[in-house]
Amino acid sequence: MEQTFIMIKPDGVQSGLVGEIIGRFEKKGFSLKGLKLLTVDRAFAEKHYADLSSKPFFNGLVEYIVSGPVVAMVWEGKNVVTTGREIIGATNPAESAPGTIRGDFAIDIGRNVIHGSDAVESARKVIGLWFPEGVANWSSSLHPWIYE
């Protein structure tokens, strides 16, 4: 089964959106496999966003991520990477549809509440970074009611 990495950014945590966001993924039928509330240091944030290090917004992004606690999660389910991105909405909240997390709760691209993996391979890499000890291996009793 496919897994994805989802992170509620400091503005999402400070705004009290953790439960709402978890609920949206659970209601879709995805299984929560890993969860951490933590404040990351600069070196870790730079490693997480290494693919963006040449971008002009990189330093601001890193400062934002280390500014407060984040919630790091691993979700599992059929097409969870693609569907997770649809639940989240466009990177720019102004382009996010109502009903998406960013469409409902974010205004500015620089404070867009949540991060989600964009591909299965990048999810695998980031999950290894954030959860080197691994994640919970369990199956919901609802699986037969959700998946064919």
Curated annotation (Swiss-Prot):
Top enzyme category: transferase
Gene3D superfamilies in the record: Nucleoside diphosphate kinase-like domain
InterPro entries in the record: NDK-like_dom (IPR034907), NDK-like_dom_sf (IPR036850), Nucleoside_diP_kinase (IPR001564), Nucleoside_diP_kinase_AS (IPR023005)
Binding-site list for ATP: 9, 57, 85, 91, 102, 112
Keywords linked to the UniProt accession: ATP-binding, Kinase, Magnesium, Metal-binding, Nucleotide metabolism, Nucleotide-binding, Phosphoprotein, Transferase
Catalysed reaction equations from the record: a 2'-deoxyribonucleoside 5'-diphosphate + ATP = a 2'-deoxyribonucleoside 5'-triphosphate + ADP; a ribonucleoside 5'-diphosphate + ATP = a ribonucleoside 5'-triphosphate + ADP
UniProt GO BP: CTP biosynthetic process; GTP biosynthetic process; UTP biosynthetic process
GO function terms (MF aspect): ATP binding; metal ion binding; nucleoside diphosphate kinase activity
Pfam families, per database record: NDK (PF00334)
EC number: 2.7.4.6
Location of the active site: 115
Cofactor: Mg(2+)
Keyword Metal-binding: yes
Function: Major role in the synthesis of nucleoside triphosphates other than ATP. The ATP gamma phosphate is transferred to the NDP beta phosphate via a ping-pong mechanism, using a phosphorylated active-site intermediate.
Family: Belongs to the NDK family.
The protein, known as: Nucleoside diphosphate kinase A
Organism field: Flaveria bidentis (Coastal plain yellowtops)
Organism placement in taxonomy: Eukaryota, Viridiplantae, Streptophyta, Embryophyta, Tracheophyta
